[in-house]
Amino acid sequence: MKKVTAMLFSMAVGLNAVSMAAKAKASEEQETDVLLIGGGIMSATLGTYLRELEPEWSMTMVERLEGVAQESSNGWNNAGTGHSALMELNYTPQNADGSISIEKAVAINEAFQISRQFWAHQVERGVLRTPRSFINTVPHMSFVWGEDNVNFLRARYAALQQSSLFRGMRYSEDHAQIKEWAPLVMEGRDPQQKVAATRTEIGTDVNYGEITRQLIASLQKKSNFSLQLSSEVRALKRNDDNTWTVTVADLKNGTAQNIRAKFVFIGAGGAALKLLQESGIPEAKDYAGFPVGGQFLVSENPDVVNHHLAKVYGKASVGAPPMSVPHIDTRVLDGKRVVLFGPFATFSTKFLKNGSLWDLMSSTTTSNVMPMMHVGLDNFDLVKYLVSQVMLSEEDRFEALKEYYPQAKKEDWRLWQAGQRVQIIKRDAEKGGVLRLGTEVVSDQQGTIAALLGASPGASTAAPIMLDLLEKVFGDRVSSPQWQATLKAIVPSYGRKLNGDVAATERELQYTSEVLGLKYDKPQAADSTPKPQLKPQPVQKEVADIAL
């Protein structure tokens, strides 16, 4: 035990010495208006907004890896779903009286419409090129079995017809119809099994890594933008004039430099929490993080791939977190179609796929250790789920696949380790600590530094999330006529809700579909699927939304 303690102490001292050495060597200082930490889709999106809003502002982006979009934004490290709640059942929880709540589904869909408009605008500007390289039409389906689940899906479908955003969704309990929609899912299935499915033709598969690379490539064309790769942030210090001095180490030659920035955005994915803590702002003390990874089964066999064109999402088991929702998806990656099934949760103390095993420990402080303990005690179902996932065997994963693909063959599939997600834990006056759903922008009172924490729905809502950040940090500028006009040019529906306005919804979907090369047929009137007799349900507490 003494040897272990001594080893840990020496490692801590060594890491601190490296950090101090980097600070000492950082003699030259670079000045920039905006410093973007992290080369993922969030930094790329914010940089693209600011390039249009304030083209004269200088920007510097630093990324610790040798290329951009290599962590969570990488197409192989996420599910590639254009999350719009067309099929994700966790966005429509069932209330105690049996009714279906659609508020979150509407909000998620509204957010994705902003992303579609943002991307379409960038295509028109020539910033994004060849839309098929990053977004493709892939129908979105929900699929369930068993009487209770069928009743739930029928009720969900009926509830969503209240929203203009979900017009065009179809519902069926007919085996033949569902087989036509998703043959791979139905072939070999018990013909007596009670099943149901919904299908929306305008679903999408998105390669967020490709979007990120193209956005950053466009930013690099301007002389007042600098991209520094293999560059790791080692220290952040607020100056007396409310600017920030950020020490950045070059991981290739061991040198370091100071970057003086008027505004700092920490868009470093799983590393954002530690950097936010390093900044020393009081707001950082309220947060902790818990990492969860994911694995997928992948098939590139043409016999499988050519037999499936849909993203098919199931229903999580009672008490399990939404990230446990199984889905079998058509993906377009590296220019070719593949099929993925999962996710299967994994556990590592790393906050990034290319992170350190010390990430969890080094982010635990006297301020956030108690909230973390409270969350662990209050979310035993989540803990139990993670333990069960870690214990899964190869056979267990294959049996899970066969529930969605009855005729699956082991030799057609391989296991792939996707990215890490860090779930937000926030201090709470009543409960001590709570799991926060979705993502959260954390900034200082002066609006000089901001970080994005959280994971889901993540990249698919990068455009609206960065809009929220602009409003939070640059509120005075956002309200100016100049910024208002520019933002409405980028996002035509900015400041308005599409939900409830059929004409506006159809207009924006038609516009973005034409520009992005996506399928869109004006939806017909909703069918007359009968509403089910709703059964009262036990009240279920909200669980962590950490879907991949």
From Swiss-Prot:
Pathway named in the protein's UniProt entry: Carbohydrate metabolism; tricarboxylic acid cycle; oxaloacetate from (S)-malate (quinone route): step 1/1
Cofactor needs: FAD
Low complexity: compositionally biased ranges: 530-541
Catalyzed reaction equations: (S)-malate + a quinone = a quinol + oxaloacetate
Pfam family, any one: Mqo
Residue numbers spanned by region Disordered: 521-548
Keywords: FAD, Flavoprotein, Oxidoreductase, Tricarboxylic acid cycle
Gene3D superfamilies in the record: D-Amino Acid Oxidase, subunit A, domain 2, FAD/NAD(P)-binding domain
Enzyme Commission number(s) of this protein: 1.1.5.4
GO BP of this protein: tricarboxylic acid cycle
GO MF annotation terms: 2-hydroxyglutarate dehydrogenase activity; L-malate dehydrogenase (quinone) activity
Highest taxon, organism lineage: Bacteria
InterPro entries: FAD/NAD-bd_sf (IPR036188), MQO (IPR006231)
PANTHER family: L-2-HYDROXYGLUTARATE DEHYDROGENASE, MITOCHONDRIAL
Family according to the record: Belongs to the MQO family.
Protein name stated in the entry: Probable malate:quinone oxidoreductase
Organism: Escherichia coli O139:H28 (strain E24377A / ETEC)
Lineage: Bacteria, Pseudomonadati, Pseudomonadota, Gammaproteobacteria, Enterobacterales
